[in-house]
């Protein structure tokens, strides 16, 4: 007959084990709250409206790095907010044109940062048709070449064209040619995706130019500096401490 050996734990050791477990749980919860608490609060604080445009920085994308650097902007991606089957979603060109839960889009961004731009009151009558136009593009592939003249489509182009069609030809932001941007540091990457020379005359709508559209107002942002990178650098210089002269 086999015997079951029972190890008696000293009360002091049991006490230490319990407190160590409690401490580990508290450390985990504190770390979780530190990392995710602010963005969770921002998510619940933001009150979505149909047609809001969400801008963010994508942290692990080569093309996002090119877009932000070439345009001197914190934004490399955008999508339009709408309610689908009772849930807030973001219609976006991300790998392909699709709809993604708002929470998933927010938590996907660099530092969980995002900015919300809203159509001004006199333009809100165009929102429903703009969203319908966006949905007509569902399943179209993402355009890594940022060309506005093919069957593929990129994030800011999706919203720009949908609004332009809804408004009867009104531009949402200013088109710029690639040659007007700071493309030189990213020439190798551009040539790789282009499979040829840099198309300097190609006109594109960038996330920055879309955000600067006169039809939009910035209404909410979290953990993202909405200023151009050059403005941040200028501010940094303002706070530079000069070395002492030794007097």
Protein language model regions, located:
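Cysteine-nucleophile amide-bond enzymes
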Residues: 2-247
